[in-house]
Amino acid sequence: MIKRVLLMQLLIFLSIFTQETPKKNIKTDYISPYSFNVTVERIENELKKMNIPVFAKFDHSLNAKKVNLDLGEITVIVFGSPKVGTLLMQKRPEVAIELPLKVLISVNKHNQTEIKLQDIQKIAKDYNLENDDIILKMETFLNKLAEKTIAKD
């Protein structure tokens, strides 16, 4: 009886710690040659040039400092085009939780500025929108935004 209980406890323990880690809806594709602040500014400027509205900018570093905590450099910019996002939400309303689009800019442990993009293909898969033209355009747009941001002038 004791062996059976111990075996059950071991199985429960193993099942808890061997579960697959959930896949993130972000990916790191770009290292900026510019400083953190310059990279944030360049992203904002690129969005402005493309007439893409910025809905919010979250300076998580500043928010952490306000409560006497240190976070390092982390900012999230929320942006998008209702002309594009609305079409996607008409097909799958629940995808609205993923929109508007976001880009995360942070400094890694090697003191490099990273640009982290939403993994549009993962989102497409999660909402059964693979191979949708709008999804492909969003992915192309995000990559173009990052590439223009890190391009040498």
What is the role of each PLM region?
Residues 1-4:
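Positively charged n-region of N-terminal signal peptides that target proteins for export
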Residues 121-153:
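C-terminal partner/receptor-binding element of secreted or periplasmic proteins
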Residues 19-52:
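Terminal, regulation- and interaction-focused segments at domain boundaries
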Residues 10-18:
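Hydrophobic h-region of N-terminal signal peptides that target proteins for export
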Residues 39, 43, 60, 138-141:
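Stable alpha-helical elements in mature extracytoplasmic
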Residues 33-38, 55, 129-136:
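Soluble non-cytosolic domains of exported or imported proteins
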Residues 103-128:
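Beta-strand/loop substructures that line and gate deep hydrophobic ligand-binding cavities in soluble
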Residues 48, 57-104:
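Compact, glycine-rich, soluble single-domain proteins
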